[in-house]
Design a protein with these regions (language model features):
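Non-cysteine beta-strand/loop elements that form the S-adenosyl-L-methionine
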Residues: 33-37, 99-104, 127-139
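Helix C-cap/helix->beta junction micro-motif
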Residues: 28, 95-96, 130, 166
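Short, glycine/charged-enriched secondary-structure capping and boundary segments
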Residues: 20-22, 48-50, 88-91, 114-117, ...
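Anionic group-transfer/hydrolysis microenvironments
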Residues: 8, 77-79, 105, 139, ...
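Glycine/small-residue-rich loop that forms an oxyanion/phosphate-binding "nest" at active or ligand-binding sites
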Residues: 66-129
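A short acidic, helix-capping loop that chelates divalent metal ions and anchors anionic groups
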Residues: 40-48, 108-113, 141-145
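Conserved phosphate/ATP/ADP-binding segment of small-molecule kinases
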Residues: 117-180
């Protein structure tokens, strides 16, 4: 059976994070493994609290997965802070992960900040160069690229700028462009 690992936050409401990733994996016949980076208290009304796990706990989970079995693919989601991003990137590099998809979760749908500014910079410097694909929404693409996205041509410019980090492909996800 195919296996994939998701490295992300836990969503108590079940609509995002690890819980949503596992549902998606299962729908495609993929056995999902998890590394939890943060625990959130959230529901359909928004995010009430976020608690990042200690870096050592994240590292222990990752080592436990990779020392036992390889995964065909790895996806990252909410990573929380610079230290977690740095450690995850180091371990993914050490274990030579080839199929890495980065969902650069910076804000929740309701607007709560989920990754520190230093975490964003660490992601650009250490994690994106390891990735095959990055899937930012419009707001995340603006932050990663430094380009304001107002029209379709801006999307292409932002994607090209993100490619300069070393990631091999960029897919801007929709639903966040004003007026569309």
């Amino acid at each position: 059976m195919r296996t994939a690992l998701t490295i992300a936050g836990s969503d108590s409401g079940g609509g995002a994070g690890i819980q949503a990733d596992l549902k998606t994996f299962s729908a495609f016949g993929v056995f999902g493994k998890t590394v939890i980076t943060s625990i959130t208290s959230q529901n359909t009304l928004g995010v009430q609290a976020v608690d990042d796990l200690p870096v050592g706990v994240v590292e222990s989970q990752l080592k436990s997965i990779f020392e036992d079995d390889k995964c065909q693919a790895v996806k990252t989601g909410m990573l929380g802070n610079e230290q977690i991003v740095d450690r995850v990137a180091s371990l993914l590099k050490r274990y030579r992960v080839k199929k890495l998809v980065v969902d650069p979760v910076i804000f929740s749908t309701s607007g709560k900040k989920l990754l520190t500014l230093s975490g964003v910079e660490m992601m650009k410097k250490r994690l994106l160069p390891l990735a095959y694909l990055v899937t930012p929404n419009i707001r995340e693409a603006e932050i990663l690229s430094g380009i304001k996205i107002r029209r379709p041509a801006d999307r292409k410019r932002a994607a090209r700028e993100i490619l300069k980090t070393g990631v091999r492909a960029v897919v801007l996800t929709g639903g966040h462009l004003k007026g569309k």
